[in-house]
From Swiss-Prot:
Required cofactor(s): K(+)
Protein known as: tRNA modification GTPase MnmE
Family: Belongs to the TRAFAC class TrmE-Era-EngA-EngB-Septin-like GTPase superfamily. TrmE GTPase family.
Comment on bound cofactor: Binds 1 potassium ion per subunit.
InterPro entries: G_TrmE, GTP-bd, GTP-bd_TrmE_N, GTPase_MnmE, MnmE_dom2, MnmE_helical, P-loop_NTPase, Small_GTP-bd
Protein's job: Exhibits a very high intrinsic GTPase hydrolysis rate. Involved in the addition of a carboxymethylaminomethyl (cmnm) group at the wobble position (U34) of certain tRNAs, forming tRNA-cmnm(5)s(2)U34.
Keywords associated with the record: Cytoplasm, GTP-binding, Hydrolase, Magnesium, Metal-binding, Nucleotide-binding, Potassium, tRNA processing
Gene for this chain: mnmE
Gene Ontology cellular-component annotations: cytoplasm
GO biological process, one term: tRNA methylation
Limits of the TrmE-type G domain: 220-369
């Protein structure tokens, strides 16, 4: 539980040695704490949102560091509370001593995500925006960053608020019939309310369809590179990365384990997984590698099946039943295409010359064009798993409310479903919250955020 009377402090920049570090402090005791560790009258020189040079001192008056203090008085701060950001030299000893001094003067160590949690609790942002802060920090691609920034700007929250307003409108009409039970819902009114609810169902469906794209943006597209031994899987990994990551050899079975690296492709994050060649083998270690290959294939979002197009075609490599899209890469085409492969649809590719790379990139983008979130106005909308859960429940209650009106049931039943739908919308933005939900969200943040 966050105590608003507690003043918290933590390092906002990454731990370790660097040129500059930033210590963030927030809470009602900020000014008193600064007075204790700076020269007399320093705090009188502080001006809102301006950096002021000062020497931070320990309890004996000895200098800890020359620092710049930027003062953000409430409510115009990140957290909505009095906040100070101390920019000091980035040595680990300096930041450690400075934090200890702040704690000695009355500050408490911040919990992970506590600054952003306070911003939410103080109304500086809704819960979707608070989640977006972490998405911005962890974004692994241009599209993921764009979606996170859209959410931080209130893109999802605005759509949820619009749905909420429509639900409140319908509920107000239903409540009126509860208050005046002698009147029945007229056919025209029922038709209008049903049209509104069905429109909401369509909007909810549109939002729910962005969940898979949101997962791909946040986690990256798991792309397994698979095929028989010695067809150039590791060479393909190295080619896409632009450097030698995997060992390449003409000896079959060189790759015994999965090798995973990430790249950005046309704004998308791809998690490339080089796998062991699949074949019948009595080698225990190679069998273990093949087991891992099958596991990677089962969990992949995309499979790049590599074949040596310069040699005769053999039977397809044994693999588990796949649900992921599959692209056939006809590798080593610089050595000539064997007649067996000439009529086979696939991407002609050469790790030696780079031929086919553009075609491969276009094919990958095309494979996910329908899954990735699209623009809604000027926003890129991509809900997360929590949003998906609550929106799904909301949609079910909207559907039940529609059925209740259609069956001309007592308005109390319709109102009950509408209130439940509103509750689930409120869970998304934090208008309705539980401490368990907040704890789960903010515990994934870093200390200084």
């Amino acid at each position: 539980m966050t105590d608003p009377e507690r003043t918290i402090a933590a390092q906002a920049t990454a731990a370790g040695q660097g040129a500059i570090a930033v210590i963030r402090m927030s809470g009602p005791g900020c000014m008193d704490i600064l007075k204790q560790c700076t020269p007399a009258a320093f705090t009188e020189r502080l001006r809102p949102r301006r950096a002021t040079l000062v020497c931070i001192r320990d309890a004996e008056g000895a200098a800890i560091d020359q620092a710049l203090v930027t003062w953000f008085p409430a409510p115009a701060s990140y957290t909505g509370e009095d906040t100070a950001e101390i920019s000091c030299h980035g040595g680990m000893l300096v930041t450690d001593r400075l934090l200890k001094r702040l704690y000695q003067c009355g500050a408490s160590p911040a919990e992970p995500g506590e600054f952003t949690k306070r911003a939410f609790l103080n109304g500086r942002m809704d819960l979707t925006q608070a989640e977006a802060v972490m998405d911005v920090i962890s974004a692994g691609s241009d599209l993921a960053l764009k979606a996170a920034q859209s959410q931080l700007d209130g893109g999802i929250g605005a759509q949820v608020d619009e749905l909420k307003d429509n639900l409140v409108h319908v509920l107000a009409h239903i409540e009126a019939y509860i208050d005046f039970p002698d009147e029945d819902i007229s056919p025209d009114t029922a038709s209008d309310l049903l049209a509104r609810l069905r429109n909401m169902e369509e909007k909810l469906d549109t939002l729910l369809k962005t969940a898979e794209g949101g997962r791909l943006l946040r986690e990256g597209i798991r792309t397994a590179i698979a095929g028989p031994p010695n067809v150039g899987k590791s060479s393909l990994l190295n080619t896409l990365l632009g450097y030698d990551r995997a060992i390449v050899s003409n000896i079959a079975g060189t790759t015994r384990d999965t090798v995973e690296e990430s790249i950005q492709l046309a704004g998308l994050a791809l998690r490339l997984i080089d796998t062991a060649g699949v074949r019948e083998s009595s080698d225990v270690i190679e069998q273990a590698g093949i087991t891992r290959t099958n596991r990677a294939l089962e969990t992949a979002d995309l499979v790049l099946e590599v074949a040596d197009a310069s040699t005769p075609r053999v039977k397809d490599f044994p693999a588990p039943v796949l649900t992921a899209p599959r692209l056939l890469i006809l590798n080593k085409c610089d050595l000539g295409i064997h007649p067996d492969w000439k009529a086979v649809p696939g991407i002609r590719f050469s790790c030696a010359t780079g031929e086919g790379r553009k075609e491969l990139e276009e094919a990958i983008i095309q494979a996910f064009s329908s899954s990735l979130p699209g623009e809604t106005g000027s926003s890129l909308v991509a809900i997360n798993a929590r949003h998906q859960h609550e929106l799904g429940l909301c949609r079910e209650h909207v559907r039940l409310a529609s059925e209740s009106i259609s069956r001309q049931e007592s308005p109390e039943f319709t109102a009950l479903e509408l209130r439940e739908a509103l509750t689930h919308l409120g869970e998304i933005t934090g208008a309705v919250d539980t401490e368990d939900v907040l704890g789960a969200i903010f515990s994934s943040f870093c200390l200084g955020k």
